Each structure stands twice: as C-alpha cells, then as structure tokens.
From Swiss-Prot:
<feature type="binding site">
    <location>
        <position position="402"/>
    </location>
    <ligand>
        <name>L-aspartate</name>
    </ligand>
</feature>
<feature type="binding site">
    <location>
        <position position="483"/>
    </location>
    <ligand>
        <name>L-aspartate</name>
    </ligand>
</feature>
<comment type="function">
    <text>Sodium-dependent, high-affinity amino acid transporter that mediates the uptake of L-glutamate and also L-aspartate and D-aspartate. Functions as a symporter that transports one amino acid molecule together with two or three Na(+) ions and one proton, in parallel with the counter-transport of one K(+) ion. Plays a redundant role in the rapid removal of released glutamate from the synaptic cleft, which is essential for terminating the postsynaptic action of glutamate.</text>
</comment>
<feature type="binding site">
    <location>
        <position position="396"/>
    </location>
    <ligand>
        <name>Na(+) 2</name>
    </ligand>
</feature>
<dbReference type="GO" id="GO:0051938">
    <property type="term" value="P:L-glutamate import"/>
</dbReference>
<feature type="transmembrane region" description="Helical; Name=8">
    <location>
        <begin position="473"/>
        <end position="494"/>
    </location>
</feature>
<feature type="topological domain" description="Extracellular">
    <location>
        <begin position="298"/>
        <end position="318"/>
    </location>
</feature>
<keyword id="KW-0630">Potassium</keyword>
<dbReference type="GO" id="GO:0016595">
    <property type="term" value="F:glutamate binding"/>
</dbReference>
<dbReference type="GO" id="GO:0048667">
    <property type="term" value="P:cell morphogenesis involved in neuron differentiation"/>
</dbReference>
<keyword id="KW-0029">Amino-acid transport</keyword>
<feature type="binding site">
    <location>
        <position position="483"/>
    </location>
    <ligand>
        <name>Na(+) 1</name>
    </ligand>
</feature>
<dbReference type="GO" id="GO:0098796">
    <property type="term" value="C:membrane protein complex"/>
</dbReference>
<dbReference type="InterPro" id="IPR018107">
    <property type="entry name" value="Na-dicarboxylate_symporter_CS"/>
</dbReference>
<dbReference type="GO" id="GO:0043490">
    <property type="term" value="P:malate-aspartate shuttle"/>
</dbReference>
<feature type="binding site">
    <location>
        <position position="398"/>
    </location>
    <ligand>
        <name>Na(+) 1</name>
    </ligand>
</feature>
<dbReference type="GO" id="GO:0098712">
    <property type="term" value="P:L-glutamate import across plasma membrane"/>
</dbReference>
C-alpha cells in the first residue's frame, strides 16, 4: 500500500509537467500565428515554390487525366498530349549518365581508402537490412490479407513474358558489372538471348529395330543420326544504360584518383567541376519539372485500361501491395532513421518532398537522381561526399519497394493457382526476391526478368505474370517512390554514422593546406625583402 501511495504523487507530478509543456507549446504556437506577416507568407511561398508547384502538378494532372478519359482519345492523341512529360523524362535521363560518373568519381576521390571502406560497409549493411525487412513485410501482408482467393480463370491477362533462366540472368548481372567497352556501356547492356539450333545426335545401330535392319542390309553404315532441336543461350544486347557497369568502373576510378594525391589533382578538379555543372543544369530543369509531371500523370491516366477489367482479386492485390509499401515507407524506414540518428525523420522527409513527387511522376529512381541530389544537399544539408558516394550506388542496387513487390506478387500468383507454399519455399522466395532486387539494375527489363527468376525458383507458372501487368504501371510508381525514400534516408544514416571519419578527413585536408602555405612562405618573404615598398594588395590586384 505504501508503495502505491508513493507512486501516485510521482504520476501526478509527471502529468502536471506534461500539461505545462503542452500549454507552453500551445502559447508559443499562438504567438507565432499572431506574428505572421505578409512578408513571412511571401518568403515561405518563395522558399517552397518548387514543392508547392510539384504537388499542384500532381493534383491537376490527376484531375485532368480523369476529366479527359470520357473523350476516348486515340493512342496518337495521347502521345501528343503527353509530349511535355516525355521531354522531362528525356532531360532527366540526359543528366543521369554524367551525374552518376562525376558524383561517384569525386565522392570516392574525396575519401581515403579507410573512410570509403567503412562508409561502403555501412551502406551495404543498411541496404541489406532494409531489403530483407521489405521482403518479410511483403510476405506477412500477403499471407494475412490473402488476395488470391478464388480462381484465375476470370482474371484479365495482358502482355507476354520472355522466359529466362536464373543462371543466365545471374551471369548477365556479373557480365554487366565489367563492360568490355565503356562507350557502349553508356547505351547498351549485355543480355543473353536464346535461339533454336539443330544438333545431329548419333544412334547406335544395335539400339533400335530399324538400326538392326539397316545393319543387316548395309554393314558399311555403323550409325544413324537424328536431328534434335534445342534452345541455346547466345550473346546479345538491349538498349539502355549499363548503370551497374558504370558504377563499378566509376568507384574504382575514383578510388585510384584519390590515392594518386598531387598527380590526380587535375582529374579530381575536372570531375568536381563536371559535377557542379550538372547540378546547375538540374537547378534549371527543376523549374520545368512541375509541368512535365502534370502531363506525365495525365497521359498515364488516359492510357490506363478500363477499370472494369480489374476484378476483385487484382483489386485486393493492389491494396495489399499499397499497404505493404506504406508500412515500409511510413513506419519502418522513418523508425530506423530515428533509432540510428535520434533525429526527427519527418523533418528530413519534408526536405525530400519534391524528389518523392518526381519519383511518383517519372516512375524511375535513376531519372529522379538529379532531383534527389538537390534535395539532400540543399534542403537537408547532407555532406556532398556522402551523397556522391551513397546515392548512385543506392539508386542502382537498393530497391526496397521492388523486393517487397516481387515477394508479395510471387505468393499472390501461388494463391491464385491454389498452390500451397511450405516454409522452405517461402524462405526460397525471400532469398531470391532479395537477390533479384539487388541485381535488378544489371538485368535488362528488370521488372519482368527478376519476377520470372523468383517464380522459377519455386516452380510457379511464369506466364501468370500477365495477370498483374494491368496494374503494374501504377504500383511501379509507388515502388519507385519507396526506393528513392530508402536511398535518401540511407544517405542520412550513413552520414550520421560516418561523421567522425568526415571530421578527421576535414582536419587532414586543413593540415595539408597549412603545410602548403608554410612551404610557400619563404618565397613570399624573399619577394618582400627584395621589394619592400610593394604591399600585398598590389600583388593580388595584378593577379
């Protein structure tokens, strides 16, 4: 009884302190609202003009798209209508290649081998952790909601699936990491293709009755041959930037330049200037982004199939994917950021708003990369050495939304086929989806190819991917937004964990500058002795 009586005053004092804190915050908020002037409103609108315009573009684009759907525009008319959006995609994709190369080279060159190794390890651990969590969330959600009830016979199918073996896809990934021609890697990727070839297979004469007869007729013929057709892998290529190969080369090249000290200074300055020039171009393109996003979204809504073809199972599948992505993006990633940095994740995410909306509009994390750089460095103040190192790698291999979607979609296809997966098969799906999402950038046509690999790993029919293609255009945008959010929060986490290495590097750079100045000092003193009447200002003016 005594113990409980002692606890009551403590609880009362805590409640009083909490209430006082709430009152103080309320009064402060009221004062702030009362002190707001027209100038404050103008400055707020000016500072957040990009974000407000981009949000408005999404809203207007959605309304415009649905408003024009009753007019049943032809494919040609929709393409003409979407042209401003196509221009935005082309502008952003134009900057991706030089941005990835220059940012990675400068990022790696600015760090010593020890610091870059630690940062790389932290980034990889973060990527693996969030990807595995995303896969687990996808599996749990699809098992709980069970959207695949019923039969697949009445479900709408769309598109065709190209078959590919897991071994060839994995080998293509490794091949693309080491492109034989860097120029070709800027616009082509290696992809194994398949062609039908005929082989002559010998048949021993004594193995068949026919062989025995012929042997009796003509002893000169020892064997017969039959023609066998077989699909064999042959080297091929597809159009598209080999991002994985360029990332690997740029990281190695930057690492070597960083270790060259004074000899590599000219190259470091060149790539640093290139990176700065690209970011200035990004600043110009950002003003056009809202208009492009408006027409991209409106055009995609006009292209959309009739909503009537989407049955109950596909609608439930869509809801399941959205719930899984929301849990990962709204709960897991911000919580992980808070646990590591002890900072408010929503303030950080607020600075990323334009990058997230651009990802939603473009459906490409690579095309969004220039905007992501701008948001992280200018709005959130993330160190450039971190963004240049973490973001290009993250955009290439860290795809949480893709991993969640692939694991969830595989189990959904199993459900519509009434295929009961055991625990071992679910683990297989988890591992395959994780590996497939990490290597997606090195595999051409990543979405479909990686999905085929996941289904093949547990013996599910790959043709059933056509069941989910009808809604994939929409879910792909949500996956991309989740991927960009994961990359950006990862940059914030890696910066927090690497703050000591960055400070030490700053001190080393400061010491080297002092040493250089001290080495130059004797020459300045001699010049002063020879010409004592000339002030320092005159010499600076002449220069």
């Amino acid at each position: 009884m005594t113990k409980s009586n002692g606890e009551e005053p403590r609880m009362g004092s805590r409640m009083e302190r909490f209430q006082q804190g709430v009152r103080k915050r309320t009064l402060l908020a009221k004062k702030k609202v009362q002190n707001i002037t027209k100038e404050d409103v103008k400055s707020y609108l000016f500072r957040n003009a990009f974000v407000l315009l981009t949000v408005s573009a999404v809203i207007v684009g959605t309304i415009l798209g649905f408003a024009l759907r009753p007019y049943k525009m032809s494919y040609r008319e929709v393409k003409y209508f979407s042209f401003p959006g196509e221009l935005l995609m082309r502008m952003l994709q134009m900057l991706v290649l030089p941005l990835i190369i220059s940012s990675l080279v400068t990022g790696m060159a600015a760090l010593d081998s020890k610091a870059s190794g630690k940062m790389g390890m932290r980034a990889v651990v973060y990527y693996m952790t969030t990807t595995i969590i995303a896969v687990v969330i996808g599996i749990i959600i699809v098992i709980i909601i069970h959207p695949g009830k019923g039969t697949k016979e009445n479900m709408y199918r769309e598109g065709k699936i190209v078959q590919v073996t897991a071994a060839d896809a994995f080998l293509d990934l490794i091949r693309n990491m080491f492109p034989p021609n860097l120029v070709e890697a800027c616009f082509k990727q290696f992809k194994t293709s398949y062609e039908k070839r005929s082989f002559k297979v010998p048949i021993q004469a004594n193995e068949t009755l026919l062989g025995a007869v012929i042997n009796n007729v003509s002893e000169a013929m020892e064997t017969l041959t039959r023609i066998r057709e077989e699909m064999v892998p042959v080297p091929g290529s597809v159009n598209g930037v080999n991002a994985l190969g360029l990332v690997v080369f740029s990281m190695c090249f930057g690492f070597v330049i960083g270790n060259m000290k004074e000899q590599g200074q000219a190259l470091r300055e060149f790539f640093d200037s290139l990176n700065e020039a690209i970011m200035r171009l990004v600043a110009v393109i950002m003003w056009y982004a809202p208009l492009g996003i408006l027409f991209l979204i409106a055009g995609k809504i006009l292209e959309m199939e009739d909503m009537g073809v989407i049955g109950g199972q596909l609608a439930m599948y869509t809801v399941t994917v959205i719930v899984g992505l929301l849990i990962h993006a709204v709960i897991v990633l911000p919580l992980l950021y808070f646990l590591v940095t002890r900072k408010n994740p929503w303030v950080f995410i607020g600075g990323l708003l334009q990058a997230l909306i651009t990802a939603l509009g473009t459906s490409s994390s690579s095309a969004t990369l220039p905007i992501t750089f701008k948001c992280l460095e200018e709005n959130n103040g993330v160190d450039k050495r971190i963004t240049r190192f973490v973001l290009p790698v993250g955009a290439t291999i860290n795809m949480d939304g893709t991993a969640l979607y692939e694991a969830l979609a595989a189990i959904f296809i199993a459900q519509v086929n009434n295929f009961d997966l055991n625990f071992g098969q679910i683990i297989t799906i988890s591992i395959t989806a994780t590996a497939a999402s990490i290597g997606a950038a090195g595999i051409p046509q990543a979405g479909l190819v990686t999905m085929v690999i996941v289904l093949t790993s547990v013996g599910l029919p790959t043709d059933d991917i056509t069941l989910i293609i009808a809604v994939d255009w929409f879910l792909d945008r949500l996956r991309t937004t989740t991927n960009v959010l994961g990359d950006s929060l990862g940059a914030g986490i890696v910066e927090h964990l690497s703050r000591h290495e960055l400070k030490n590097r700053d001190v080393e750079m400061g010491n080297s500058v002092i040493e250089e100045n001290e080495m130059k000092k004797p020459y300045q003193l001699i010049a002063q002795d020879n010409e004592p009447e000339k002030p320092v200002a005159d010499s600076e003016t002449k220069m």
